[in-house]
């Protein structure tokens, strides 16, 4: 049996390294439990990390204007940074990895894309699926600032893709 497991790992290394976390919930369930929630703009990225400009700290403490956020691949349960193009804005719920770096997880909805004056993602939906929601950005920012006290009323808008 051990030989079969080893053979499988050698022949399919991607499968052996796949993320195994379960989706723990929408933005409204996971965001307030993180170290830092920011409104940010992506400056640049390389293979597995991105530099973001902090436009506003919504929750937590961060004095730097530019921070590093780790992305990843299928093996480390972090999203590929290619999904965050330079120049785009996001509401990011981040976990501190060390004194200088934050991490972003795929194990819940830890980011919302900013599209004009709207925030888009899985905001309140209790199950992971193709449907995304949209809410006024000002309402989402207010919700985070209030510690989840203010009301959010997102609406379903689109499919998340293939």
Predicted features, each with a name:
Residues 19-34:
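Short boundary/loop segments of OB/S1/cold-shock single-stranded nucleic-acid-binding domains
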Residues 33-55:
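Structural detector for short beta-strands of small beta-barrel domains
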Residues 77-162:
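Netrin-like (NTR/C345C) domain of secreted extracellular proteins
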């Amino acid at each position: 049996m051990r030989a079969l497991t080893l053979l499988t790992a050698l022949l399919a290394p991607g499968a052996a390294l796949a993320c195994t976390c379960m989706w723990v919930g929408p933005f409204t369930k996971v965001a307030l439990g993180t170290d830092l929630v920011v409104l940010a703009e992506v400056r640049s990225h390389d293979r597995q990390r991105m530099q973001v400009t902090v436009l506003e700290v919504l929750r937590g403490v961060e004095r730097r204007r530019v921070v590093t956020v780790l992305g990843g691949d299928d093996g480390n349960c972090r999203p590929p940074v290619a999904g965050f193009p330079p120049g785009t804005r996001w509401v990011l719920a981040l976990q501190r990895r060390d004194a200088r770096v934050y991490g972003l997880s795929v194990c819940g909805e830890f980011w919302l894309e900013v599209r004009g004056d709207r925030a888009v993602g899985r905001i309140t939906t209790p199950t992971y699926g193709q449907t995304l929601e949209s809410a006024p950005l000002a309402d989402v920012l207010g919700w985070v600032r209030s510690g989840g006290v203010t009301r959010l009323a997102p609406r379903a808008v689109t499919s998340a893709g293939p």
